Every structure is written in C-alpha cells, then in structure tokens.
C-alpha cells in the first residue's frame, strides 16, 4: 500500500511502485489523497525543508516537516485496507531512534492506534485483531541499510529524501 498525499517528493510514489514490482507483490494499491489542502508542513506546503541539521541539539520541538495527522491517516487507511483483505498484520516503516520529533512515530502512538483499531473495526470487534508491526522502529538508519543489504532488498530503487533534486536525494535534509 502506497499513499500519494500531495507530498513534494512525489518520486517516493514511483519508487514504491518499482520496489513492489521488483519484489513481485501480487497487488500494489496506491491511494491518492491531498494533504496539501490541510497544509502546515514543509512536505505539503511552500515552507522550506530544513537542511544540514546534523546534531540533535539543533532539533527542538516538532519540525516543520511533520505533516499533521499523516501517520494517523495512513494507518487508518492501512487498517481499512487490511480489514478488506482479511489481513491480520500491518507493517509500518516508522523509526524512532533517528527521531525527527514526529509524535506519530513513537511506540506509544502505535500502541494506542492498535488499541483503537481493536475497538473501531469489524475485524477487531469480531475477535480478528489487526496488529501493527514496526520492525524498523528501534533501528538506526545505518542498521536499516545493513538489514536491507542482508535481506537483498532492492535498495537502489528506494528513495528517502524530502527535497529531491529531480530523482536524486539532496543529501542535506533530515
């Protein structure tokens, strides 16, 4: 499942399509919604994406790259999709160790969301719970790359940049 949410880094959606194809996904659903109408983030508005913030001391408060409600919305869509498919697990790529200050990338958010899904979905009420798995949550970015290499993941197809220059990462954003 990929969500095109009006992000300035739309290359992310194309790369997700390529990764799904490379991994032989039987189905790759792309949901489009436009969070630019809400605004409030450098990823969906005209605010400048912060660059060169190397030390955690430079990071105070919730950064301008936080998209209000993004992961809440994404996980809600994933839960609805999983319920329709009859799936019991949702895998989510949140990471807390290289924490950017996003409140919706914390373990307590994921635990609370899973509880909400248990109480607010047909699957949960009928005793077929949906569980959230975030295997990258406690890994550093370097550990994530190492694990990807170990698993033979098509890392050359991935994209992780908020302010790309064409198809290339800027090398300076968070």
List the predicted regions and their residue ranges.
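Short hydrophobic/aromatic-enriched beta-strand-loop microsegments
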Residues: 155-157
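Local cysteine-cluster metal-coordination motifs and their immediate loop/turn environment
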Residues: 76, 159-174
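ATP-dependent adenylation/nucleotidyltransferase module used to activate substrates
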Residues: 1-152
């Amino acid at each position: 499942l990929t969500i095109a949410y009006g992000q300035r880094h739309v290359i992310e959606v194309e790369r997700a399509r390529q990764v799904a194809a490379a991994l032989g996904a039987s189905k790759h659903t792309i949901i489009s919604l436009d969070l630019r109408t809400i605004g409030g983030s450098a990823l969906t508005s005209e605010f400048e994406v912060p660059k060169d913030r190397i030390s955690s001391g430079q990071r105070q408060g919730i950064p301008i790259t936080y998209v209000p409600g993004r992961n809440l919305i994404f996980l809600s869509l994933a839960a609805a999709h999983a319920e329709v498919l009859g799936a019991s697990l949702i895998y989510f790529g949140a990471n807390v160790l290289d924490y950017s200050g996003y409140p919706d990338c914390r373990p307590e958010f994921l635990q609370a969301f899973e509880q909400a899904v248990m109480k607010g979905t047909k699957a949960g009420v009928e005793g077929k719970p949906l569980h959230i798995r975030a295997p990258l949550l406690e890994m550093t970015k370097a550990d994530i790359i190492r694990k990807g290499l170990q698993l033979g993941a098509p890392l050359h197809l991935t994209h992780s940049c908020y302010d790309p220059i064409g198809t290339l990462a800027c090398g300076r954003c968070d």
